[in-house]
Amino acid sequence: MSAGRCGRLQEERGKDMSKDKYESPLCERYASKEMQYIFSPDMKFKTWRKLWIALAETEKELGLKDENGNPRITDEQIAELKAHADDINYDVAREREKLVRHDVMSHVYAYGVQCPNAAGIIHLGATSCYVGDNTDVIVMTEALKLVRKKLINVINELAKFADQYKDLPTLAFTHFQPAQPTTVGKRATLWMQELLLDLSDIEYMISQQKLLGSKGTTGTQASFLELFGGDHEIVRKIDGKIAEKMGFAECYPVSGQTYSRKVDSR
């Protein structure tokens, strides 16, 4: 189960649950406040709204028109969306979900209640995975960055420890048997080396993270081709603009509605 799908479970537990942290027995015992926030409902749904803003800005910048040839999206509508990007009206979304049984459509509705002038452009042309999968990638990337930060701190402290005890002798072992002398500092460098290998893997994973983008129902972007009158050149620009606005270098070049689930398994 991916990050966003796990996080979805806690929103359903009731009104009194905190929205700024991910809750589970394991989290309560072992997770940092920073990591709990990354997997929290607040992080998830605020990211959904950032993605909706990025999509609306992209469609406006690419010249989306209505049936009369007028701009479909205005600066005023985008400003309204931005004004309510962080104040999630959970109660409205919860009540709406009781009716429609769909988390994304419930939050589209709730956002529209706060932004009546922009309600018609929220999620325009997109599918649920536009917010669901892209948010999962963003959450996983932020979690990896936090692990990287903490790992670097541990390596730095171990380096100080190794230097402090570089001349302190101790007995080294081979095959779990006493062997030859070494120093405590040298032994600590072995731990550091293991963590540096881990750090290299994490750096690589972060560098390889890509967004899904906005591929439509089956990965063909058919809904966007319809919105833009069949102009393939314009539609090809959508993913790149969204990636840039969300702080990523690129999106996956091909997909179905979802990104490859190998991303989750890695």
Predicted feature locations:
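A helix-coil-helix interface module used to build multimeric assemblies
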Residues: 18-245
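Short linear loop/turn motifs
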Residues: 83, 256-260
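A short, charged helix-loop
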Residues: 240-257
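A conserved active-site cap/scaffold subdomain adjacent to cofactor or substrate pockets
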Residues: 262-266
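Short, Lys/Arg-enriched N-terminal segments with co-localized hydrophobic residues
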Residues: 5-16
